[in-house]
Amino acid sequence: MPNKNDSLLYCSFCGKSQHEVKKLIAGPSVYICNECVDLCDDIIKEEIAEINSASESTTSDKKLPTPHEIRDNLDDYVIGQDTAKKVLSVAVYNHYKRLKHGAISDGVELSKSNILLIGPTGSGKTLLAETMARLLDVPFAMADATTLTEAGYVGEDVENIIQKLLQKCDYDAEKAQHGIIYIDEIDKITRKSENPSITRDVSGEGVQQALLKLIEGTVASIPPQGGRKHPNQEFIQVDTSKILFICGGAFSGLDSVIEQRVDTGTGIGFGATVRDKDSKATISETFQKVLPQDLIKYGLIPEFIGRLPVVATLTELDEHALVEILTAPKNAITKQYAALFGLENVELEFRENALIAMAQKAMGRKTGARGLRSIVEEVLLDTMYDLPSVKNVSKVVIDENVIAGKAKPLLIYSEEQERLASSDK
């Protein structure tokens, strides 16, 4: 231990004197030499390298499911939409294969294939994207295109989308770069006319322009832990070329644009094709014929469409599909409410005619699968309110009259249940 009366200065970490080292840096009551600084620097670099390699190996070593496996998993949670599932499975598989093996293979650069989902409200666009992210165990963030504006205008900056993704993975940029971002209501940012605008359209064409670089791939500078940007702060750098962007929208009116292009039924002359008035295709069938020029006419700019090369169309859900959605998926709505009632030791039964009535009600409201939960909630609200205060209820039965509002749910009490069971014997 150096003598306190000694005039020499010593490193507080290794104990070497100022004559034994090149530089001794003074702090409040402590000193550190250049050798200890170098040692600390090496230790920190090694730890950072270990963290990065662990993160990279976790991503690269993770088994990538095949398109068939992706499709099978989607089938467990999403009813119907077979074509969209197949398109999505292949596109997502190719995207993560590109990340796993590098964007360049044998000198050929592999471009990113972002996805555009076109389908009616409640057809399963958001659910497909969410289920895909859960299967692949990657961060997932969702944004509403209607809230976005160009930078510098009142509204949400497009880079806030990346911030949402960072928040989902505790601001780990490496994890975020392997995530999926779903932008909903993309059809609401179409420009007002087919011709380029000479005035600012900050929530339409302007947002499309702002999204271009982000979707194609750029290094976005994101403020840590949220907040607005200012010059004197450090930013988190996120490479968006590795992020998969899925855009979705109902595209109301797009069917008319497509029909104008493909319709030859109004032609005249010997070569014209005469089409029966009653042979009008459904909206879902028309959507399947969509081409880039239709989307341009609808209001998306050509550059934006070019960044979304994979297009999947979803069909409108019919009564049979809606009934299946209520009962078949692993997390079906009726199963969720049955589990909720089970926590009260009460069995919940939906009769077949009740399921059909709920499906018809959702179709009447034109809300698709999205409206089913609110219908079930409306039907069960009073029962869920009263049930914790009522004793000896063993079963609740819902039939079509309950859905129509003509009757209340049937409550079966435990004594009655026992009596019915004994009478069956």
Curated annotation (Swiss-Prot):
Residues engaged in binding ATP: P120, T121, G122, S123, G124, K125, T126, L127
Organism, as annotated: Psychromonas ingrahamii (strain DSM 17664 / CCUG 51855 / 37)
Every ClpX-type ZB domain range: 1-52
Binding partners and assembly: Component of the ClpX-ClpP complex. Forms a hexameric ring that, in the presence of ATP, binds to fourteen ClpP subunits assembled into a disk-like structure with a central cavity, resembling the structure of eukaryotic proteasomes.
Sequence intervals crossing the membrane: none
Cited CDD domains: RecA-like_ClpX
Pfam families: AAA_2 (PF07724), ClpB_D2-small (PF10431), zf-C4_ClpX (PF06689)
InterPro entries according to UniProt: AAA+_ATPase, ATP-dep_Clp_protease_ClpX, ATPase_AAA_core, Clp_ATPase_C, Clp_protease_ATP-bd_su_ClpX, ClpX_bact, P-loop_NTPase, Znf_CppX_C4
Underlying gene: clpX
Protein name: ATP-dependent Clp protease ATP-binding subunit ClpX
Summary of the function given for this chain in its UniProt record: ATP-dependent specificity component of the Clp protease. It directs the protease to specific substrates. Can perform chaperone functions in the absence of ClpP.
GO CC term (a single one): HslUV protease complex
Protein family (similarity comment): Belongs to the ClpX chaperone family.
Listed NCBIfam families: clpX (TIGR00382), PRK05342.1 (NF003745)
Residues at which Zn(2+) binds: C11, C14, C33, C36
UniProt feature coiled coil, ranges: none
Keyword set, alphabetical order: ATP-binding, Chaperone, Metal-binding, Nucleotide-binding, Zinc
Example of a GO biological process term: proteolysis involved in protein catabolic process
A molecular function GO annotation: protein dimerization activity
